[in-house]
């Protein structure tokens, strides 16, 4: 699994846990719906740290909490 796929899955997981839609997440995070849709659809292969930080702020969690999920433990090495 790539970091992009893991971020997508983590965002979806957090939305499910909090019972919020992706549209609501975009609004409370201050990012555009299209940016979030690109992350979730996989069109955005490398989400920026600043976008993840905005999502974390919207969810009222730390970046550390976002990345502490087990899904990030066994990522593939990505060489560009």
Spans of model-derived segments:
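Short, basic-rich loop-to-helix N-cap that marks the start of a DNA-contacting helix
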Residues: 43-57
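Short, charged recognition helix plus adjacent turn
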Residues: 1, 38, 67-80
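The alpha-helix within a helix-turn-helix
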Residues: 15, 26, 56
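Recognition helix of helix-turn-helix/homeodomain-like DNA-binding domains
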Residues: 31-46
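Residues within the helices of the helix-turn-helix
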Residues: 12, 23, 53
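A short, Lys/Arg-rich alpha-helix, primarily the initiator
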Residues: 1-20
